[in-house]
């Protein structure tokens, strides 16, 4: 039997006693991350009926669940992830790497020449435990997401992305400011206090 580290025991204790974990189970969301998007949307109204959006790194699907609920039948939600994701009503899911041409071709066929109103991205790399390496890999994913957003968003569109404060943060913020009229930071209550994660919201794509 494997012996758990102190850090993994602490995480498990925190998870079991987490208010948002219990809420997610009660409300039918696949992960507590749903409440981060709900809180941001309550403030910024980036998702509303009729919104056309893409959810990058969507699995297990809590953000796509929220998006489908908020866009309603008049909106469109595309979800992309390398990992499998169980079907969600109102969500068109593509399993694959959005950097690859065949995956982009599938997405663009579904998009049918419509520009996106919004791109959302709650991706994070598999953590190795090496802080420097993990931070670099995290921002690499963020850069890929920003490139995707810059190519597919309509003029005036928005981009919401999770980043981790540290090396590369200021440079990434500057890159977003070149593409969007405004860039704001958001730290939802559902984000754990000990986490360095923060969300950047770019609005009014140039």
Swiss-Prot record:
One Pfam family per UniProt: FtsJ
Reactions that this protein is recorded to catalyse: uridine(2552) in 23S rRNA + S-adenosyl-L-methionine = 2'-O-methyluridine(2552) in 23S rRNA + S-adenosyl-L-homocysteine + H(+)
Enzyme Commission number, as recorded: 2.1.1.166
GO molecular function, one term: rRNA (uridine-2'-O-)-methyltransferase activity
Top EC class of this enzyme: transferase
Active site: 162 (proton acceptor)
Keyword Iron-sulfur: no
Keyword check for Methyltransferase: yes
Amino-acid positions noted as binding S-adenosyl-L-methionine in the UniProt annotation, renumbered to this chain: 61, 63, 81, 97, 122
Keywords, comma-separated and alphabetical: Cytoplasm, Methyltransferase, rRNA processing, S-adenosyl-L-methionine, Transferase
A GO cellular-component term linked to this record: cytoplasm
InterPro entries, alphabetized: RNA_methyltr_RlmE, RNA_MeTrfase_FtsJ_dom, rRNA-MeTfrase_E, SAM-dependent_MTases_sf
Cellular compartments annotated: Cytoplasm
Protein family: Belongs to the class I-like SAM-binding methyltransferase superfamily. RNA methyltransferase RlmE family.
Reported function: Specifically methylates the uridine in position 2552 of 23S rRNA at the 2'-O position of the ribose in the fully assembled 50S ribosomal subunit.
PANTHER family linked: RIBOSOMAL RNA METHYLTRANSFERASE (PTHR10920), RRNA METHYLTRANSFERASE 2, MITOCHONDRIAL (PTHR10920:SF18)
Identification of the protein by name: Ribosomal RNA large subunit methyltransferase E
